[in-house]
C-alpha cells in the first residue's frame, strides 16, 4: 500500500517530479515494481498532475515554489471544508477493504515469482543444459479441460481448487549443442485469489453468474472451501535497534539478503566506560570494536569519525557529549592495543569445527555459503580460520549490502546517542519498528523454497534415467503444486529443507468466516503477531500509542489470543516494495536531490556541521545531503511510494521502500506528497495467457479512496496538523469494520465495544446474495433483515445497509412482571409469527466416489437389500443412489405420515429455494440421503462390502432444498444434498443489541398479554432496566431517542462517533422537530387493561439474533453409543453422546442432598460395573468362585465405575495393590 495517492485534484508536479517521471518510464521499463504503487493507484490520479507540466514547458521558478494542490486552490477554504470533502468522498468500493490482500498477491505474481525464476541459474545434468524462460499465467480452468472456464462459483460447487497454471518457456541444450525451446512448461498451479488480476471476476468486468456483487474478494478457494491468508507481523530488518541492557546499551542489526532470504544478526554492546564489543556472525564470543575496525582496514581517526563520536581538531577530538568522548577514547584505546595482524587475532575466537559444527549443521552451512563463497573443509587449521574471518568481514556481517565499517559505526553512533540522551531506545512494540508479511510475501516464501526443491528433485530424477528427456521430467513433477495446496489446506506454512527443521507458522491459512457479511469483511482484515498464543509477553498484547489509525483498539478476541490477533483500522494498509535500485536512481536523477552527495561517508554528517544529514535507503548508507529540508521536500514529491523519515536530532534521513510497512490515510492540504510518475499500462487482463509486466500494477483498476498514505515511521517523526499532514476524523480511521458500525461508540465503556465487535460476527444476517448457489457445511440466513434508522457513516461505506445482519423491533425498557427476566428479554409472539428474527439454517451433505486401491473404494449407488441398515429409511433413493424428491409414492407417505410425527403444517413455506416439490418434502432423522457402499478386503483376503450411506442425524432434520450431482476435480461423481431448517425464535435463544446488551429470551408472550400505549403500539421486545446501570450503555438510549424522532419524521440520523459536539442539544432539537414533548409513554397492561403506575420508555432499537440457538444445542438421550475403552457415553451432540456431569454439577447435587440423583448420573447411566472381591484379602479377583491370591472361596460383588476398575488395573501393573475393606 503506497502513500503517494492524492485526492482527485492531485498536486501540481514540479519540473523535478516531471523529469523523474520521464526518466523512470523510459529508462527502467523492466525494473520489478518500479512504481512502488499499491493502494493509491498512480495511473488513476496521476494524469492530472503529470499533464500539467512537462520537462520542456516547465516554469524555471517551479522548483523553488511550494507544491500547492488544486483542491486547496479551488475548493478548500479552511480545514473544516477539507475534512467535509474527505468524508463525503470516502464511500469506498468493497474491494478497497481487501486491497492489501489483492495488491500484495498481484505484486507476487507479476514481480516476485518471475524474479525468482529469472534468478535461477541454468541447470546442467548429464550433458544437458536447462534454462527457464519468462513466466506467464493461464486463466483458471478445470484440470484437464483448458478450453473451459473455472469460475469461483464452479470451484465451490465442485470442491475444486481455484488455481492458475504458472507456465514458462524451457530452453534445453543437449550434449551435441542442439537447442530446443519448449513453449509451455507448467511449473506449478498457484491458488488464485478471488478478485486478483488473474481471476475471472476481474477479467470479465461484471459480476459472474453465481457470484455476489458485494463480495470483496481477497480470499482463496481450496478444495471448495474459502480460505484467507492472515498477514503476520514481524520485527523490521535492516536497521539498528538500541535497547537498554542492564547498566549498558545493546544495539542489534538484523540484515537480510532479499534474493536468498537469509538473515544475520549482529550485536554491539557498551557500558560507555570500559566495554565496547561487537559480535561477528557465526562467532559466539564478543570481540572489541576497535579490533574489528582495524581488521576492516580503518585507522583510529576514521573509526571515531565513522561512529559519529566527534571530529578531530589536530590531535584532539571534539565530541558532542561526555558519553561520546568516553566512547571515542575507548575506541582509540582498543584500536591502539590491537595487534598488527587483527585477522589472526580474530581467528583465535573462531571455535574448532568439531566442537561447533556437527555434520548436520556443517551441511547447512555449506549450502548457505554455496551461492557466495565456499568454506574450506578443515576449519581447525590456522590458515582456514583466517580465511574464514576474511570471508566473514568481506560479506557476511551485513547481508543487505553497503560498507561494513560504516554500518558498524552506525551501530556505535546509535548507542552513543541513546546513552547521551540525544536519541531514544528502540521501542519493540512501536509499529514503526514492525513489518507485515502479507499474502504476497508469505506465498513468495513458499515458492522460493519449493522452486529450489523442484530443481533439486529434477537433478536427482534425471541422474537415474537412461533415456533422459528434461522437459518430460520437469513437466511431470508436481512437488510445487502439491506442497502449495497442502500449505493452503492445513495452514501450516513451511517448506522442507535440508539441515535442522525450520520454524513452522501455524494457522496462516484459515477458513473464511461466513456467518454474516460483517464477519466476512472483518476476517479479511485480520492480522496477527508471528508468536505463540501462549507467550507471556504482556507488552505485546497491550495497546500502544502507535496503533492509532493502524490497528483497531476494540476488535481482538478474548482469552489467550487477546492482543495477538488484531484487526486493521479502516484506513490502514501495507506498503508494497519499491526496489532499492529504483530509489537510488531517482535520488541520483539529473543533478540529484538538493544537496545530495552520492557516496559521501556518513561521518561528514554525523561529525560535521549541524546543517547536514546522512541518507540511507532501506538500511544502506548511500550518501550525505547538505540541505535536509530541500532533500526531504523533493524526495516526497519524486518518491510517492517511499517513506521519507527525517530524524533531525540524529541527523539521519531514511528512505524506506521495503514492503510491509504500516501505512494509513492522512490529509495533505499543502500538497506535500506528490503523485509521482505514471505507471506503465497494466497488462490486458482479458487475454487467455497473461504475460507478466514487472513494472506494472494490475490492481490499478481498483477504485482508490481519497487522501495520501503515510507510514508509521514517518508519522512518528512528523507533526500532524502542524503544516505537514492533517489527520482525518477519528471516526474514519480509529476502528475497523465491526466496531465502526456501533452507534455512538464514544458514549459507552470500552469493554462494551469489544464485546459487540465479537458478537457482531456471531449475528445471523445475510452473508451473500448468492446464498442459493452456495453449499457451505452450515449457513445461516436471516429471513427479514432490516436497516437501522440511526447508524454511522461506516454502515453505508461497508455496505451493511444492503447486507444487514439485524432487525428493528420496538423496544420497551420495563420489568414486565420480572418473571425470568434477570438478564433476559421478553419477545412478542405475534411479532415472531410475522417473521421477526426468523431465520433459515442450510446444511449441506457432500459425498463423492473414492478409489484408493483396487480393493479399497467407496461408490455412490443404491445399496442391495442384504447390506442395508434396518434402522435407516431408503425409500427416497433413486436408482443412482441419490435422494430423488420426485418419487411420488414415497413423497405421499412422507407428507402424510412424517408431517404428523414432526407436528408441522402441510405445505409450509420457509424460504430458501424455488417453490416446488422440495418445499414440501420434510426429511426426518434416519432418512438416507446418499447411498454408498464400501468395498474392501476382509481378514481372510475375501472381498467385503459394507453400507456407509449418508443419513440425516437427529439434530439435522429439515426440508429438502436442493440436490446437485456433479463431477469433482478428479473426475469422480460428487453429490451434494442441501437441507433447509427454519429456525423461529424460542426461549433460550440469544439476542444482542448493537451496543452489546446481550440477553437470552426469557419469555414469549402473545400480543394480547403485552403492554400497549394509547395509539395501540405494542413493543416487540422488552428489556430489563437493571441492565443499564452496570453496563453503562448510554449509546443504547441515544439510539432509541434518535430512532423515535426518525420514525416520526421519516428520515435517518447519523450516529457516527466523535461527530456531535453536544449530543444533548442535538436530541432536544430532534425532539422539537418531531413534536415530541416527552420521551416516555403511558402504557397499559395487556392482561388487566389497567394503566401502569410509571411511564415507560419505548422506541425502535436494532437488535441482532446470534447463532447460539436452543435448537442447535438442545440434546437428550436414554441410550446410545459408548466408548469402547471406558464404556462411558461418548461426548458430543452430533454423535448422540451423553450429558456431561462436571464438578460444578456434582457439588450442586450434593448441596441439594440429591445423592441418589448424583449416583444415577455418574454411575447408573454411565459405566456401571461389578467386580468380584475376595472377603479374606480384599483384592479384586479374576474369578467369581475363588481367589487365586489366597485360595479363599468367600467372594462378594462390588459395584464401581468401569473407569475405576481400569485405574486399579493400571496401578497394579506398576506394583501398587488395591485392597477393599
From Swiss-Prot:
This is Putative DNA-directed RNA polymerase II subunit RPB2 homolog. A zinc finger (C4-type) spans 1174-1190. Mg(2+) binds at residue 823. Residues 1-63, 673-701 are annotated as: Disordered. One of its GO terms (cellular component) is DNA-directed RNA polymerase complex. Belongs to the RNA polymerase beta chain family. GO terms for molecular function: DNA binding; DNA-directed RNA polymerase activity; ribonucleoside binding; zinc ion binding. SUPFAM superfamilies: beta and beta-prime subunits of DNA dependent RNA-polymerase (SSF64484). InterPro entries: DNA-dir_RNA_pol_su2, DNA-dir_RNAP_su2_dom, DNA-dir_RNAP_su2_hyb_sf, RNA_pol_bsu_CS, RNA_pol_bsu_protrusion, RNA_pol_Rpb2_2_sf, RNA_pol_Rpb2_3, RNA_pol_Rpb2_7. Zn(2+) binds at residues 1174, 1177, 1187, 1190. Residues 1-54, 692-701 have a biased composition (Low complexity). GO terms for biological process: DNA-templated transcription. It comes from the Viruses. Pfam families: RNA_pol_Rpb2_1 (PF04563), RNA_pol_Rpb2_3 (PF04565), RNA_pol_Rpb2_6 (PF00562), RNA_pol_Rpb2_7 (PF04560). Keywords: DNA-directed RNA polymerase, Magnesium, Metal-binding, Nucleotidyltransferase, Transcription, Transferase, Zinc, Zinc-finger. CDD domains: RNA_pol_B_RPB2. Component of the DNA-dependent RNA polymerase that catalyzes the transcription of DNA into RNA using the four ribonucleoside triphosphates as substrates. Second largest component of RNA polymerase II which synthesizes mRNA precursors and many functional non-coding RNAs. Proposed to contribute to the polymerase catalytic activity and forms the polymerase active center together with the largest subunit. It catalyses: RNA(n) + a ribonucleoside 5'-triphosphate = RNA(n+1) + diphosphate. The keyword Acetylation does not apply. Its EC number is 2.7.7.6.
Amino acid at each position: 500500500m503506497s502513500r503517494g495517492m492524492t485526492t482527485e485534484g492531485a498536486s501540481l508536479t514540479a519540473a523535478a517530479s516531471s523529469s523523474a517521471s520521464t526518466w523512470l518510464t523510459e529508462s527502467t521499463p523492466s525494473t520489478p515494481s518500479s512504481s512502488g504503487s499499491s493502494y493509491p493507484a498512480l495511473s488513476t490520479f496521476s494524469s492530472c498532475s503529470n499533464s500539467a507540466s512537462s520537462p520542456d514547458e516547465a516554469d524555471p521558478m517551479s522548483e523553488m515554489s511550494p507544491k500547492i494542490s488544486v483542491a486547496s486552490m479551488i475548493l478548500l477554504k479552511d480545514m473544516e471544508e477539507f475534512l467535509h470533502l474527505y468524508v463525503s468522498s470516502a464511500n469506498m468500493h468493497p474491494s478497497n477493504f481487501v486491497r492489501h490482500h489483492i495488491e500484495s498477491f498481484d505484486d507476487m505474481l507479476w514481480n516476485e515469482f518471475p524474479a525468482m525464476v529469472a534468478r535461477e541459474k541454468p541447470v546442467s545434468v548429464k550433458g544437458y543444459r536447462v534454462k527457464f524462460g519468462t513466466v506467464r499465467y493461464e486463466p483458471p480452468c478445470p484440470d484437464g479441460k483448458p478450453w473451459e472456464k473455472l469460475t469461483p462459483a464452479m470451484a465451490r460447487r465442485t470442491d475444486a481448487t481455484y488455481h492458475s497454471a504458472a507456465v514458462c518457456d524451457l530452453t534445453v541444450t543437449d550434449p551435441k549443442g542442439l537447442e530446443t525451446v519448449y513453449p509451455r512448461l507448467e511449473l506449478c498451479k498457484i491458488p488464485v485469489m478471488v478478485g486478483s488480476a488473474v481471476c475471472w471476476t476481474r477479467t470479465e468486468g461484471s459480476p459472474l453468474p453465481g457470484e455476489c456483487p458485494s463480495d470483496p474478494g481477497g480470499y482463496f478457494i481450496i478444495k471448495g472451501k474459502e480460505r484467507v491468508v492472515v498477514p503476520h507481523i514481524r520485527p523490521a530488518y535492516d536497521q539498528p535497534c538500541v535497547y537498554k541492557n542492564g547498566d549498558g546499551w545493546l544495539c542489534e542489526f538484523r540484515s537480510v539478503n532479499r534474493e536468498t532470504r537469509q538473515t544475520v544478526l549482529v550485536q554491539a554492546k557498551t557500558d560507555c566506560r570500559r566495554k565496547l564489543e561487537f559480535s561477528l556472525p557465526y562467532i559466539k564470543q564478543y570481540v572489541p570494536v576497535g579490533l574489528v575496525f582495524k581488521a576492516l582496514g580503518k585507522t583510529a581517526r576514521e573509526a571515531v569519525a565513522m561512529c559519529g563520536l566527534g571530529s578531530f581538531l589536530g590531535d584532539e577530538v571534539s565530541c558532542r557529549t561526555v558519553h561520546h568522548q568516553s566512547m571515542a577514547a575507548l575506541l582509540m584505546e582498543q584500536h591502539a592495543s590491537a595487534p598488527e595482524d587483527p585477522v589472526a587475532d580474530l581467528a583465535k575466537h573462531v571455535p574448532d569445527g568439531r566442537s561447533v559444527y556437527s555434520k548436520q549443521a556443517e551441511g547447512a552451512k555449506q549450502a548457505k555459503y554455496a551461492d557466495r563463497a565456499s568454506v574450506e573443509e578443515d576449519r581447525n587449521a590456522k590458515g582456514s580460520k583466517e580465511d574464514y574471518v576474511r570471508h566473514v568481514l568481506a560479506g557476511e556481517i551485513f547481508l543487505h549490502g553497503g560498507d561494513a565499517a560504516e554500518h558498524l559505526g552506525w551501530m556505535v553512533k546509535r548507542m552513543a546517542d541513546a546513552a547521551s540522551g540525544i536519541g531514544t531506545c528502540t521501542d519493540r512494540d512501536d509499529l514503526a519498528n514492525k513489518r507485515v508479511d502479507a499474502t504476497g510475501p508469505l506465498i513468495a516464501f513458499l515458492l522460493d523454497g519449493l522452486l529450489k526443491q523442484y530443481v533439486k528433485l529434477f537433478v536427482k530424477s534425471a541422474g537415474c534415467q537412461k533415456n533422459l528427456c528434461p522437459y518430460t521430467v520437469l513437466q511431470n513433477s508436481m512437488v510445487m503444486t502439491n506442497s502449495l495446496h497442502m500449505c493452503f489446506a492445513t495452514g501450516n506454512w513451511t517448506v522442507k529443507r535440508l539441515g535442522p527443521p525450520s520454524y513452522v507458522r501455524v494457522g496462516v491459512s484459515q477458513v473464511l468466516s461466513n456467518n454474516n457479511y460483517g464477519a466476512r469483511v472483518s476476517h479479511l482484515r485480520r492480522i496477527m503477531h508471528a508468536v505463540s498464543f501462549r507467550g507471556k509477553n504482556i507488552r505485546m498484547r497491550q495497546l500502544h500509542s502507535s496503533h492509532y489509525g493502524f490497528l483497531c483498539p476494540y476488535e481482538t478476541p478474548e482469552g489467550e489470543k487477546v492482543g495477538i490477533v488484531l484487526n486493521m483500522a479502516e484506513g490502514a494498509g501495507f506498503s508494497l516494495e519499491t526496489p532499492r535500485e529504483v530509489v537510488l536512481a531517482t535520488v541520483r536523477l539529473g543533478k540529484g536531490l538538493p544537496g545530495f552527495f552520492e557516496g559521501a561517508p556518513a561521518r561528514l554528517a554525523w561529525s560535521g556541521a549541524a546543517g547536514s544529514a546522512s541518507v540511507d535507503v532501506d538500511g544502506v548508507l548511500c550518501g550525505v545531503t547538505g540541505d535536509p529540508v530541500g532533500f526531504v521536500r523533493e524526495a516526497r514529491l519524486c518518491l510517492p511510494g517511499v517513506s521519507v523519515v527525517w530524524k533531525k536530532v540524529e541527523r539521519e534521513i531514511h528512505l524506506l521502500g521495503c514492503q510491509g510497512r504500516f501505512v494509513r490515510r492522512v490529509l495533505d492540504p499543502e500538497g506535500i506528497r506528490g503523485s509521482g510518475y505514471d505507471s506503465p499500462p497494466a497488462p490486458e487482463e482479458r487475454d487467455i495467457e497473461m504475460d507478466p509486466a514487472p513494472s506494472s500494477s494490475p490492481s490499478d483498476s481498483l477504485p482508490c479512496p481519497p487522501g495520501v498514505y503515510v507510514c508509521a515511521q514517518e508519522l512518528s517523526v512528523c507533526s500532524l496538523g502542524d503544516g505537514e499532514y492533517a489527520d482525518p476524523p477519528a471516526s474514519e480511521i480509529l476502528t475497523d469494520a465491526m466496531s465502526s458500525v456501533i452507534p455512538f461508540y464514544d458514549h459507552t465503556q470500552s469493554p462494551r465495544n469489544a464485546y459487540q465487535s465479537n458478537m457482531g460476527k456471531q449475528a445471523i444476517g445475510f452473508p451473500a446474495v448468492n446464498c442459493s448457489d452456495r453449499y457451505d457445511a452450515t449457513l445461516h440466513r436471516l429471513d427479514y433483515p432490516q436497516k437501522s434508522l440511526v447508524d454511522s457513516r461506516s454502515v453505508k461505506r461497508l455496505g451493511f445497509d444492503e447486507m444487514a445482519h439485524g432487525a428493528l423491533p420496538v423496544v420497551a425498557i420495563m420489568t414486565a412482571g420480572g418473571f425470568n427476566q434477570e438478564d433476559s428479554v421478553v419477545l412478542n409472539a405475534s411479532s415472531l409469527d410475522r417473521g421477526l428474527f426468523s431465520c433459515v439454517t442450510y446444511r449441506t451433505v457432500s459425498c463423492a466416489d473414492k478409489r484408493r486401491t483396487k480393493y479399497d473404494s467407496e461408490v455412490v449407488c443404491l445399496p442391495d437389500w442384504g447390506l442395508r441398515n434396518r434402522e435407516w429409511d431408503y425409500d427416497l433413493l433413486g436408482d443412482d443412489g441419490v435422494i430423488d424428491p420426485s418419487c411420488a409414492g414415497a413423497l405421499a407417505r412422507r407428507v402424510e405420515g412424517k408431517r404428523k410425527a414432526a407436528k408441522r403444517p402441510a405445505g409450509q413455506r420457509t424460504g430458501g429455494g424455488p417453490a416446488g416439490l422440495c418445499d414440501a418434502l420434510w426429511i426426518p432423522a434416519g432418512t438416507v440421503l446418499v447411498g454408498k457402499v464400501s468395498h474392501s478386503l476382509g481378514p481372510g483376503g475375501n472381498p467385503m462390502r459394507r453400507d456407509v450411506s449418508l443419513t440425516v442425524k437427529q439434530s439435522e432434520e429439515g426440508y429438502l432444498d436442493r440436490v446437485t450431482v456433479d463431477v469433482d476435480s478428479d473426475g469422480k461423481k460428487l453429490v451434494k444434498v442441501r437441507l433447509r431448517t427454519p429456525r423461529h425464535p424460542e426461549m433460550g435463544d440469544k439476542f444482542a443489541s448493537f451496543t452489546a446488551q446481550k440477553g437470552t429470551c426469557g419469555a414469549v408472550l402473545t400480543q394480547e398479554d403485552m403492554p400497549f400505549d394509547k395509539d395501540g403500539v405494542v413493543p416487540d421486545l422488552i428489556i430489563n432496566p437493571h441492565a443499564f446501570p452496570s453496563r453503562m450503555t448510554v449509546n443504547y438510549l441515544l439510539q432509541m431517542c434518535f430512532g423515535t424522532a426518525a420514525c416520526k419524521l421519516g428520515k435517518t440520523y447519523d450516529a457516527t462517533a466523535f461527530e456531535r459536539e453536544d449530543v444533548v442539544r442535538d436530541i432536544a432539537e430532534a425532539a422539537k422537530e418531531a413534536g415530541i414533548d416527552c420521551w416516555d409513554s403511558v402504557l397499559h397492561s395487556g392482561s388487566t387493561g389497567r394503566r401502569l403506575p410509571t411511564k415507560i420508555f419505548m422506541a425502535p432499537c436494532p437488535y441482532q439474533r446470534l447463532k447460539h440457538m436452543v435448537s442447535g444445542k438442545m440434546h437428550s438421550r436414554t441410550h446410545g453409543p459408548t466408548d469402547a475403552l471406558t464404556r462411558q457415553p461418548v461426548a458430543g451432540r452430533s454423535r448422540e453422546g451423553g450429558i456431561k456431569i462436571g464438578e460444578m454439577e456434582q457439588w450442586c447435587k450434593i448441596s441439594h442432598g440429591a445423592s441418589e440423583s448424583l449416583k444415577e448420573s455418574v454411575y447408573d447411566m454411565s459405566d456401571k460395573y461389578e467386580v468380584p472381591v475376595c472377603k479374606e484379602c480384599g483384592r479384586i479377583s479374576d474369578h467369581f468362585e475363588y481367589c487365586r491370591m489366597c485360595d479363599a472361596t468367600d467372594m462378594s460383588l462390588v459395584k464401581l465405575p468401569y473407569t475405576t476398575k481400569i485405574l486399579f488395573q493400571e496401578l497394579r501393573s506398576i506394583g501398587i495393590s488395591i485392597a477393599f475393606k
